[in-house]
Every structure is written in C-alpha cells, then in structure tokens.
Swiss-Prot record:
Entry binding sites for Mn(2+) 2: D78, D268, D315
Keyword Transmembrane helix among UniProt keywords: no
Cofactor binding description: Binds 2 magnesium or manganese ions per subunit.
Pfam families: PP2C (PF00481)
Name assigned to this protein: Probable protein phosphatase 2C 72
Amino acid sequence: MGHCFSLPSSQSEIHEDNEHGDGNVVCYGEEFGLDQDLPVHRLGSVCSIQGTKVLNQDHAVLYQGYGTRDTELCGVFDGHGKNGHMVSKMVRNRLPSVLLALKEELNQESNVCEEEASKWEKACFTAFRLIDRELNLQVFNCSFSGSTGVVAITQGDDLVIANLGDSRAVLGTMTEDGEIKAVQLTSDLTPDVPSEAERIRMCKGRVFAMKTEPSSQRVWLPNQNIPGLAMSRAFGDFRLKDHGVIAVPEISQHRITSKDQFLVLATDGVWDMLSNDEVVSLIWSSGKKQASAAKMVAEAAEAAWKKRLKYTKVDDITVICLFLQNKEQPS
C-alpha cells in the first residue's frame, strides 16, 4: 500500500489533522494568481509505501507557500517501537505549526539585519525541543517508541536542514562537467558515530551491536538489554533520554545555486537499499518528472528490498523530492 502526492494543491492553511493525505502523507499548497514578477513555488512530490509490518510507521509532509509565498517545508519522520506510528504522526502534524509560530515570533523580535536562514535555524532548535516535550505528555506511551525527523525549509535561495536520527537529505547538483552528483546534506545520527556513542556512554547508556547484526551499533539501558535503539537522536524514546539519546537536531544551511537541481528527503527504507548516487541518478535520468519522482524512487527501493531479501522483509519507504529550479509558472 502506498500514498503518493504531488504539488501544487489548493490549500493554504496549516492543519493538524489528516484531511490532506490518507494517513501517512499530507500535502499543502497555495494558488495565489499573483503577478508574474513575484516568486513562484518550487514543484515537489511525495510518496510513502508500507513495508511488511502491520502498520506503516513513516509519515511525511510537503508544504508549499509555508508562511510566505516563496517558502517550502518538507519533512519525513520514521517511527519505531510499539507506538512509533503515533509518534511520527504527531510530530508530522504538530511541527509545521509550532515551527512557523516560532519563526514569526523571531521576525517580530529579532534584529532586522538577522538573516532569514539564521532565524529558521533558531526556530528549529526550539520547535524540536517543544515537540519532544509535548510527546512526553501524550496518552500513548513513548518510553520505548520514537521517531526520526529530517526537515528542510527553503526560502528563496536559502535552504535549512534540521535532522534527528537516520533519515537523510541529499542534494542533486550539477558538476562543472555537466554531470549530476549527489551531495549528502545530513549525517546519519546513530551510535556508529564515535561522538554520538561517547555522549551516550557518558550518560551511562550502553552501545554495542547484536551478534546477528555485528555492523550496526545500538543503544541499550545501563542494566537491561533493551531497547537496542539504532539511532542516537530521536523524538520520544524517553527511557533513553537520561542516557544520552537526545532530541537536539543537527542543523545546516546551504545557499541554493543554479547548479542545485533537486532535494531528496527519505527514510532509511530508501537509503538501506539505494545509495545517494543511485537515487540522484534515477531522478535525473527519468527526465526530471517532478510529479512522479518520489514514487519512482520509492518503487525502486521497494523492488530492491524484495530482490535482496526474497520478499521476507520490506521496510517502510517514504520519499520527498523537491525540484529547486523548475518552478510552477503562474497562470
């Protein structure tokens, strides 16, 4: 089962329910009919395919006209644990409104000379913390349930990325030779990263790999062999928050140039099967079909899972593709 959407849409308000997507994916957009000289939206698509588990624990949002006409928000969230689907859904539903409210506060309070990207960065740090705090107040148990989160905001030529966990943002950009290449904009924040493992151990958490998966380090409680979390930063997972797992995002900024063609956000259901270069090349070789780009990547990842694991396991797969140059032309 999969859900795939493309923008533009006709909705302009932020909602915290599911009216814009059947469960796992929501898309928002605006149709302004503005003057030809005003900025126009970038085009994007999003697709989520359920794996072999009972529930698809991935959620995603693609928001066009996010606060201002020239701003887009993308986010993918990969839940884990018993209630991971509820964690990722709650984060997906709440984060856009919380983040935008914080940004608008900064617009009113901050120095007029402060760059927009810097204000988005500050808003992301605070929003992630507040959302994690809200999760701790939910009726569903988040002790050993949580979610990754990678969020991208584009405003004009500014790109801000905030990341928790092992979902990933990758840029497709042109080389001097006219070839497309992949540039990874996020780090996979897992216990395999020495600095992440060190923080966890300093907080009395344990980091080691299971015998059945010797190449994958996991996080464990000090005196119990649970839960074996495969990431070092996440929303939720509150039993591990005293032991080094944090909800502090790693944030980066990028200035979009004419060489930058598209941005891909995806959960590890994609990256566990396809390399950055494979994903970028697939989109580019397809003729940059904006409306179907995310679906194309998701289906390629699904096929790779089925081929490699003989249909015994397929992870949930969620992809957003935002094209940075080819924009919607006003009517």
